């Protein structure tokens, strides 16, 4: 099944995967602590505005609470910025998702995102037909296609004694959905947020 890009979040852990039929020549890179999806050097040139973006960021709130943001587009940055200003996770997700709306491409691709705290998680999606933002207490997935409403997801990395961001990225990259490209993972505990990525989709 092809679900496109997807986010999985739970308290303390999150992940994001790029699945793509149109632009498979992409990788995640670490740019000054922000994980960025972008084209590989051999990728064909494109003017598509949705191909490159920050997909994961670690932030601190004004009360020094560590959080991580994952998502499939340019909305990740304003979500992170609102969290840094002290917005609750619900509002930090809802405001940029509503303002930027679904992607204006041929498929009306939804924007998806999640905010992960050490003991909390919130997931959001804006589609042509609606906006959903909800707090979750177990691993939950939302995708751009097919699974475009939040639903429970079996994420083994969330059950580890010590959750690992790299393990989360690798697990979702290997998930049984078509056209995997690359993935990012995030973990959050009292000491801070950790980001990792996996580009080995073979």
From Swiss-Prot:
| InterPro entries attached to this UniProt entry | IMP_cyclohydrolase, IMP_cyclohydrolase-like, IMP_cyclohydrolase-like_sf
Q: Name one GO molecular function term.
A: IMP cyclohydrolase activity
Q: Does the record bear Kinase in its keywords? A: no
Residue intervals passing through the bilayer? none
Q: Which Pfam families does the entry mention?
A: IMP_cyclohyd (PF07826)
The function of this protein is: Catalyzes the cyclization of 5-formylamidoimidazole-4-carboxamide ribonucleotide to IMP.
Query: What is the name of this protein?
Result: IMP cyclohydrolase
């Amino acid at each position: 099944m092809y679900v496109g890009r997807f986010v999985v979040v739970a308290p303390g852990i999150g992940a994001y995967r790029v699945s793509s039929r149109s632009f498979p020549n992409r990788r995640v890179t670490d740019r000054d602590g922000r994980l960025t999806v972008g084209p590989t050097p051999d990728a064909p040139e494109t003017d598509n505005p949705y191909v490159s973006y920050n997909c994961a960021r670690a932030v601190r709130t004004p009360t020094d609470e560590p959080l991580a943001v994952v998502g499939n587009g340019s909305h990740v940055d304003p979500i992170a910025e609102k969290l840094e200003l002290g917005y609750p996770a619900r509002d930090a997700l809802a405001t940029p998702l509503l303002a930027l709306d679904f992607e204006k491409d041929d498929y009306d691709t939804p924007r998806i995102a999640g905010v992960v705290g050490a003991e909390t998680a919130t997931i959001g999606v804006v589609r042509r037909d609606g906006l959903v933002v909800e707090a979750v207490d177990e691993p939950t997935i939302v995708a751009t296609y097919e699974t475009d409403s939040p639903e429970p997801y079996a994420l083994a990395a969330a059950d580890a004694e010590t959750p690992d961001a790299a393990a989360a990225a690798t697990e979702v990259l290997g998930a049984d959905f078509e056209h995997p490209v690359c993935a990012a993972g995030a973990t959050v505990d009292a000491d801070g947020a950790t980001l990792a990525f996996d580009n080995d989709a073979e």
